[in-house]
């Protein structure tokens, strides 16, 4: 397998690592030696550096990575692949009884084509768990749902996950976390959950992906004009100048950032695409050399000031800052809200080397112990990127596996009294892979469970007793981080810049064109994927490192994922309390956050 040094350097830059040329060449050799592509190799390297607490990248770290990590892990993976290639896939997430019934139906069909004298010769079923003896198998009862074996009768639990020693460790905190008792009332209080629409909420499936290019163009143009109008009013700008109009004096232009080619944006390839009203959608190259500070990405709506003497190139001298939406104003119904605890977790809920749901069962135990008022659970619940899903080793329909997983969560947490909110993911293999993504459909809820369980769309703005949560399972931090270019005179926090873009662009996915694996229906995107207000709390799970940050008054939380490869990951818990109304300055209702290892 060949590897590109340039691609490796770009992958490393996504994680903020600059590498010497000699080390890049060494990584190229490792890619060829171990049969890895650039993305996979960098992912393994970052995982190694994170687990061993290494900072930076040196030749010693690279040698250690090769000898202690790659040679063991990848050779083991190749060995297991060769070993498994000679037999059928593991029988996961299906009862042995169902397998036996399938075998018997096949026998009946075969016997119908033979003469009666030959009789029925049933094939014996032999597995390591059930040798060739008289079999006695009973059907599963619903009470076995919480047993790991019910998810995967023949799968081996992950040894690395079960041998972890840091469970329950608080890895980062925010606010008054030390003085908070991290236990809720199990929904015993007055909990009100409402989905906010902009202008309406997505509640069901829709016809997707039949869109014409003019319709996409219309959505993008409307976005430029609407945001431009808000910024024009905020900064008291008299008028915008057409992009292609030559002028000797400084001009103010409105447009959307783009790239002059299909490659990654850089400071030499920036173009500004004008709005329809003033510039008829014209494009003009932008010279950023006069700007001391900037942060730009494709699809960003901006107002620039600069010199455009020829009408063919803008020398930018000023970049106007974006302006976020106002915060939600609580109503009288929200006035009796005192305090509540919210738990947030993001899938996958299985480790990469096993399809058993041990991490999910541990999370259920945490919920029953802490009794949070609300639990927000993000997909994927059955990960499309899991090895056994990709290799078609599962013997039960994806939909059935998901329903069993869902039933386990609902029944397993019923005693806690917690309200459950389920947010889908584009990596949920059974669900519609379109953005915005409709809520899960689950018709087996009892009347009592319907009061406690809520299915919302991806993305979604959710009000919990008047505290607005922005929810998205899409890894926007990773997507925007890979495309953003920036220049700063001082130290600049990359995550804070990206989060600020989300809030000031007023969209759950402001990047255009989107990442290749994103299937966006732009007509629905315009209706369902915009921010109605600036959320009090933005939950934005990512493969990147967990964090909690206050950005423009919004508490932004990356809870991490519940599993990271073969090891346990993290989840978050938040403590909400409505501040006193007599204060002149706004105070966040989210007073404390902790990110905890499962």
Swiss-Prot record:
The keyword Metal-binding does not apply. Gene3D superfamilies: 3.60.21.60, DNA polymerase alpha-primase, subunit B, N-terminal domain. One of its GO terms (biological process) is protein import into nucleus. Belongs to the DNA polymerase alpha subunit B family. Accessory subunit of the DNA polymerase alpha complex (also known as the alpha DNA polymerase-primase complex) which plays an essential role in the initiation of DNA synthesis. During the S phase of the cell cycle, the DNA polymerase alpha complex (composed of a catalytic subunit POLA1, an accessory subunit POLA2 and two primase subunits, the catalytic subunit PRIM1 and the regulatory subunit PRIM2) is recruited to DNA at the replicative forks via direct interactions with MCM10 and WDHD1. Component of the alpha DNA polymerase complex (also known as the alpha DNA polymerase-primase complex) consisting of four subunits: the catalytic subunit POLA1, the regulatory subunit POLA2, and primase complex subunits PRIM1 and PRIM2 respectively. Within the complex, POLA1 directly interacts with PRIM2/p58. The N-terminal 240 amino acids are sufficient to mediate complex formation. This is DNA polymerase alpha subunit B. It comes from Homo sapiens. The gene is POLA2.
